[in-house]
Amino acid sequence: MRIGVLRTQVPFVSGGAERHAANLVSALNAYGHEATEITLPFKWYPGEVLADHILAARMHDLSEFEGVPVDMAIGLKFPAWLAHHPNKLYWILHQHRAAYDLWESGDADLMHDPDGDALRQLIHAEDRAAFTASPH
């Protein structure tokens, strides 16, 4: 089975999520699958750039490359999990915390953006739509 592991990439930053994705790909390959990481660069500031990156992620079609189907996509990080694939499931490592727990605690940088509340609502709506559309 050809599997794409979806995550965002912040250039020059590497941490636990990146190691998790690499280890997941390695394990899938060890079990006989053909797996690879599919990364999308992500910048979340200022707010209009965040909205652009959400749209850009949604516009990606990951169902095939070079005419060869990708059988499954595993979404790990926002907004990469918004990319289109008909057989997508989610192993959520990173939601956009500024729209969730950091917002609730008052620590979200998004709160200081003039469009912060609208962006938070957009993120919630995009996540709900993506998760609802998943066949899993």
Where are these regions (language model features)?
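Structured loop/turn residues at beta-strand edges in well-structured enzyme cores
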Residues: 68, 83, 132-133
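Membrane-proximal helix-turn-helix segments that form the acceptor-binding/catalytic region
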Residues: 109, 113-136
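Short catalytic/ligand-binding loop motif for oxyanion handling, primarily in non-cytosolic enzymes
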Residues: 13-14, 44-47, 80-84, 97-100
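Active-site donor-binding segments of glycosyltransferases and PAPS-dependent sulfotransferases
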Residues: 31-80
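Short, contiguous strand/loop micro-motifs
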Residues: 10-12, 49, 114
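Conserved acidic residues
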Residues: 71, 86, 135-136
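N-terminal subdomain of nucleotide-sugar transferases
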Residues: 1-40
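Active-site proximal beta-strand in glycosyltransferases
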Residues: 74, 83-118
